[in-house]
Amino acid sequence: YSPTLAVAGGIASQHRGAVELCQAVNVLNAVAGNVGQTVRFGADMPTGDGYAGIEKLLAALDAGQVGVLLIHEANPVYALPASLKFRDRMKKARFKVSTATYYDETAAECDLLLPSLHSLERWDDANPRAGVYGLMQPVMEPVFPGRHTGDVLLDASRKLGGVFSKFSAPDFKTYLRSAWTGRASDEAAWRAALARGGLYQVPAEAAAVTPTGASFSAATPAFDGDGDFVFVAYPHSFLHDGRGANRPWLLENPDPVTKATWSPWIELSAATAKRLDIRRGEVVRIISPHGEIHGPAFPYAGLHDGVIAAPLGSGHTEYGQFAKDRGFNPLDLLGAPDAGSGFMPYVSTRVRLEKTHQYQEVATTEGTPRQLGRGIAEAIPLVYAKKGMTVLEALRAEGHAEHERNTELEVDAILGWREKQVEGRKLGNYAEVHPSWGMTVDLSKCTGCSACVTACYAENNIPTVGEDQVLRGREMSWMRIERYWEGGEDGEPLEARFVPMLCQQCENAPCEPVCPVFAAYHTVDGLNGQVYNRCVGTRYCSNNCSYKVRYFNWYKYNEKSWPEPLNLQLNPDVTVRARGVMEKCTFCVQRIRSAQHNAMLEDRELRDGEFTTACAQACPSDAIIFGNRRDGNSQVAQSSRDPRGYHVLEELNTRPAITYLAKVLNRVEA
């Protein structure tokens, strides 16, 4: 018996039949014998009031029963469907107070603004799930003269007296400490909780559950409207529900699937686009019984023909310079949440589509959508991976024709040239034995989430360039996630493959010999160095780079990206580049040199794994491994010897320092 698992959740279950769907999935798990195996029942998750609380508030507002409305770090004017008319109904409160950290749509409607401290500037706690209690403490002084909302409420309680007199703590930190008495009874326990960032209790034993027979309604969910398409609003991969819409790092980070940046788009299936003669970038109007939106069309082969989809997160009328007046808000098309379940009706509306005969180019970073036989994002079936086959051996086993990449004469010439190159480098400091830094990237673990990309922005002071420059192909991200489509033809399933692409730190780097001022050079430990003070901006290195991972500063991006106080986020260990300078991935050389310096001070050798690059540190699936390839026992050296390993564009003889591990395909043939 092999345990299975049925799961309900995500956007697909956000409709008026959501509760019935969850019940049906629970029944399926019980019938399949999964209860007690892959499904266990323990402590309930902590939950808020949900939509029921919103309904009570709206009823009280309509009845004129709200004297003071305090809204703390929430933006219901934007985050609720426009059909609820929360903006108009909140005006019925006699006095409205906002304690937001941003001037958002809700704050703009309030009578008093009390800016709250940022989460990095204040004390706080959280209970995200049963048994987990997070404890937050400030890591920096407040940048602006705001006050902790807790301190404001404590001051108000002391002045009001009466039932509020029990809140007598002089400040919120003291109140928080007293509230944690039950969890951290003494000073030692409190300090331990601070050091760990909270309290993480041992999960309770799974409760014994005996499924019993039950009945429930299974009516077909009703839809608002009678349009030809079902509309699906889904959280943006980076902006989520709109809370990240004023962060340029997230706006300029391409969506993993569409590779679109900055502004939202409207997805429709490729077949629907062909039938209606709609091309990418054509502005279409989507109309529902509750409202309408306008946006550029984005045909997508992975979408159902009867569905139109759009990401949440855009369409703000306030919230900051980067979020304001950018795109549309899909919530304008939706009705009220289901009163019984409280689920947002993300899949409960039928819409009509109209052409506007206007055009808006979608700012994408997509190159070629398919590999075109270049072997960039390799994959190997599980049956061959289990046998320890290489990608080439697996292709032979499947009957693919093998093409000779280089003739015997060419191979001899290449090998002889390389030997001369290596011998020629053995001068001065290059004659000594040094580490050889390298990386492996496991494509079976990479999900295309782009956490590595954002980490690289933060670590290396990379500027954002804006939508107009992205349209011109001038993005500055040192690391990009390339997405290639496989299949999707003749009934084959459509598959997306993701490949993190960065400077390969080639041993035979084509960028180095073409630089007329030796700004691009090879370091003793195998890195392709870049001397910014030497660079005169000829861009020859970029033209000669086989992987297109060098980026040129066309403007003074740094001046626009970090006006005060945003300059506080800059990494002091990394130079901020100016206009006319070429830049690229350095394998976080500042981290390498810092670790080497610390090891020298402690009179010892560098230890494998004691430091890593920002991208490897941020990867949630541990797809990236960094280390010294010359150390045969290092994790990177061992993983690079995996039979699945290959180098991108290996036939060019650039000898990259990055080894990719082919994605394992676990398919069940019909």
Listing of model-derived features with the role each one plays in the protein:
Residues 15-21, 84-85, 539-540:
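Short glycine/threonine-rich loop-to-helix capping motif typified by GTGT followed
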Residues 148-170, 175-178:
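Non-catalytic, well-ordered alpha-helical segments in soluble enzyme domains
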Residues 1-61, 183-190, 194:
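Active-site phosphate/pyrophosphate-binding segments
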Residues 43-144, 161-162, 176-477:
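A cross-kingdom feature strongest in bacterial/archaeal respiratory oxidoreductases
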Residues 10, 24-27, 31-34, 57-64, ...:
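Generic, well-ordered alpha-helical scaffold segments in large soluble proteins
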Residues 83-104, 138-157, 283-289, 296, ...:
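Phosphate/diphosphate-binding loops
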Residues 338-670:
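Non-ligating segments of multi-cofactor redox enzymes
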Residues 2-7, 35-41, 66, 129-138, ...:
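Short acidic (Asp/Glu) and glycine-rich catalytic loops that position anionic groups and cofactors
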